Amino acid sequence: IPGLPIVPAAVAVVLLFMALNLFGVTKVGNAQIVLGGILLTAFVIYVIAGFVHPAGFRWETFIAGETIFVHHSVWANLSRMLATIALVYNAYVGFEVIADDAEEVSNPDRNIPRGILLSLTMTTIIYVTVSLVTLGTVPWQQLAGSETALTDAVQHFIPGWGVPMMAVAGMIATLTSVNSAMLSATREAFTLGRDGVWPTVFSKLSR
């Protein structure tokens, strides 16, 4: 948001979710469901509109950037793939925190593995389809120097309200990350305190 002071805004977000955590795991989980649902809806709209609209995904644009392995040797393709993996890995960091909250989940032996597999599957589908639409809409040369690739692409096939939608989606993505990270951190602190690794004060419960 132009003109918004970064540090005060960040502090406000942290305090907001810290206060939310004081109301218990159920409130935190419900907030995550709502925020995640809004974020998923925005991505679904982005992908569908990008593939359907004439000004959206174009195979010619996608191929022009050589974004898939075309006319390269095996070693060249392998080198490109490994270089990409190093970057893509960070996008998947976070699914492991599901296990941190195992004690808050009913039937964790069944639901935790399902949650991890389902989250990885959904994340992979979203990342692949969003990347296809983005790289097939805007030439990679334009995206290379951009810090707002999705908003650059969405204005081609959802003019008007597309850019605000993706801007809000970006902010919500940050909020979901903060919310899940804070829940995971509190559970880790509680467990470490209970096991005697950290001071026992961290294992005390209000009720």
Describe each model-derived feature in a short phrase.
Residues V11, L15-M18, G37-V47, L87-G94, ...:
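Hydrophobic alpha-helical transmembrane segments of multipass integral membrane proteins
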Residues I1, A55-H71, W140-T148:
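Membrane-interface helix termini and inter-helical loops of multi-pass transporters
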Residues I1, T84, G115-M182, W198-R207:
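TM-loop-TM module centered on a large, flexible mid-protein loop between adjacent transmembrane helices
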Residues V7-F62, I116-L120:
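Membrane-interface loop-to-helix entry segments
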Residues I1-L22, K27, M166-T191:
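Hydrophobic transmembrane alpha-helices that form the core helical bundles
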Residues V34-I38, A99-L135, E188:
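Junctions where cytoplasmic loops transition into the N-terminal start of transmembrane alpha-helices
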Residues P2-P8, F69-S79, Q155-M166:
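Membrane-interfacial loop-to-helix junctions in multi-pass transporters
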Residues A19-T26, I45-A55, Y89-Y92, A102, ...:
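Structural signature of transmembrane alpha-helix termini at the membrane-water interface
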